């Protein structure tokens, strides 16, 4: 923590420190707002996001790597957009807000994944194929873990993070006339559950989950293509030797 504070104080690009401070103030405002509205769960989310906003500086302090300006801004946007989706109901007020975040998440986690092999062993820096494959796999793995989390929250706490979709047709072995035969119900116009009429059959989040994972995978593939074409000309991270120890002087390792 002391090293992170020193990194902020010796920031060679002061606008980054001011942007980070503005983000933390926005998170603090959102937390106070949630407490005043009595939504303690939202206030807890804000607290966690406040820690998340500090992650770019934490990574730089712990790894002695300097994050590019573009990635720094993109990470802050992604973290705050995720919080705003819940706190300010943007998931419901702006169409495809959730999908946009999953697309951004696919890019962010693939980017981080492409640098993990280098962090483990510097000799992998030039092995671009390995880094591309690891980036895509890492992003897909994070996407799957997130969907596990959403499933658990829906299953055990009665939430609806895996948003339901009304479908107009069902194809299932459970409907078949014999073992191994798929039965179908087509052109579903209405369903009644315990006396409650619905406009169609609820899929209990399956379509939303698969859509999220495909979008996140697409984001990872997009990053992989850009990474391959860039050929290291615009690195997202730059290894530094003593950036946090020499009052803002950046020394390339």
State what each model feature region is.
Residues 6-22:
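N-terminal membrane topogenic signal
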Residues 10, 58-70, 121-127:
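Membrane-interface helix-boundary motifs at transmembrane edges
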């Amino acid at each position: 923590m002391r090293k992170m504070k020193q990194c902020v104080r010796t920031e060679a690009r002061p606008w980054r420190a001011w942007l980070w401070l503005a983000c933390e103030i926005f998170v603090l405002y959102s937390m106070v707002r949630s407490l005043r509205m009595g939504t303690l769960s939202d206030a807890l989310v804000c607290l966690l996001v406040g820690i998340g906003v500090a992650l770019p500086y934490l990574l730089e302090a712990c790894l002695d790597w300097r994050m590019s300006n573009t990635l720094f801004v993109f990470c802050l946007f992604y973290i705050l957009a995720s919080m705003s989706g819940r706190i300010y109901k943007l998931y419901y007020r702006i169409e495809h807000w959730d999908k946009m975040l999953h697309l951004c998440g696919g890019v962010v986690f693939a980017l981080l994944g492409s640098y993990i092999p280098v962090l483990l062993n510097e000799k992998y820096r030039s092995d671009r194929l390995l880094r591309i494959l690891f980036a895509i796999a890492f992003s897909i793995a994070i996407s799957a873990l997130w969907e596990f989390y959403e499933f658990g929250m829906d299953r055990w706490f009665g939430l609806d993070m895996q948003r339901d979709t009304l479908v107009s047709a069902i194809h299932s072995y459970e409907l078949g006339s014999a073992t191994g035969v798929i039965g179908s119900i087509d052109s579903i116009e209405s369903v009644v559950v315990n006396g409650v009429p619905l406009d169609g059959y609820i899929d209990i989040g399956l379509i939303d989950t698969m859509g999220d994972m495909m979008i996140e995978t697409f984001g990872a593939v997009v990053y992989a293509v850009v990474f391959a074409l860039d050929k290291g000309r615009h690195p997202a991270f730059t290894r530094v030797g003593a950036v946090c120890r020499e009052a803002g002087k950046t020394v390339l390792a």
